[in-house]
Amino acid sequence: MPCVNINSGSKINIGAQIHHDCKIGKFVTIAPKAVLLGNVKIADYCYIGANSTVKQNIKIGKGAIVGAGAVVTKNVKSFDVVVGKPAKSIKKNK
C-alpha cells in the first residue's frame, strides 16, 4: 500500500501536494503550492520553495534548497541550492 512518511519537525504549508511513497526527513519545510510527485526522498533540513515541482523518483540531499518555481528533474546533492526550469545548482548552502 502506498504511503507517505513525514518526520518530526517538518512543516507542510497550505496547498502543497505530496504524492505516493514520498519520504520527508526531519526539519524539512515544504512551501505553499509545492508539488512532490511519487517516490520523492527528501533528506533532513531541506527547504522546498513555493510553486516548485519535484518530479518522480528524485532524491534531495541533506540541507538542500529548491528555489521558488523550480522544476527538479534530477537528484539534488546535499547542501546544493537549485533554481530554474529545469533546476540547476547555483551554489552551496553553508
Predicted regions and their residues:
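Generic C-terminal helix-cap and adjacent flexible tail
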Residues: 91-94
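Structural signal for interior beta-strand "rungs" in well-ordered beta-sheet cores
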Residues: 1-83, 87-89
